[in-house]
Amino acid sequence: MLEDARFSGIDVSPWGKFDRGLLAVYPLLFHLLDVAAVAGEVWDRVLTAGQRQLIADGMGVPLGEARCLVMFVAGLHDLGKLAQFQQRESHPWARVSLALRADTAGWQRMPHERASMHSALQLLEDAGYNTDASDSPGVRVAQILGSHHGRFLQLDLDGAAKASRVNLALGGPKWQDLRRRYFALLRHLTGAQPVPLRLSVPASVLMTGVGVIADRLASQRHLLAAEGSSPRIWRSGALGPDGQGRPAVG
């Protein structure tokens, strides 16, 4: 975990946002972290005290832990972009690390919000979330991710959402590992270590709303266009062929 948190510790070549006009590429991991951070601001500045308490009570955790969990869940919304989505645009796809581009055999096209829902389910279970039934907290968190474009999706626990089917559809071992590492890094950086034993429907709806707002705010074109062209890792020579950062030249 500490290694992944270092500048050169994790592959940041997969893209999250792309401006065709400016050819500006914004790394997916940065977008996930942006949305998590903005979700914390939405919690502090937009939600009422009653809404914050409703979410905390709906998860059975204190307010401070609830804030961390809301940030974590909001940040996970685009985890499903670590999949065939990456090939949608040729320019940013060409920047994806060689190792990842070589590990795509068998992956299938899937809306990224559904891919987020499906891929997160197993990761949530591995993290200790109950995913046994449709009303379990792990399943509801996964559905929050699937609904970040405004429509709640059905999650078929015994069908399309089974880990064996998901792993076949969303890329090879390197993509699976990177999804796991992004998940773990987000959880670590947001402090969302507590595992809620429940997640009520009203809390789920409010958390979905926080995530939608945070995503919209963090995805404003004028911000992404500027930031997508400026980080050190996107300067000439700042990314190695493995997609990991190295100091900029010059």
Regions found by a protein language model. Give the residues of each.
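Accessory nucleic-acid engagement/destabilization modules that flank
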Residues: 1-250
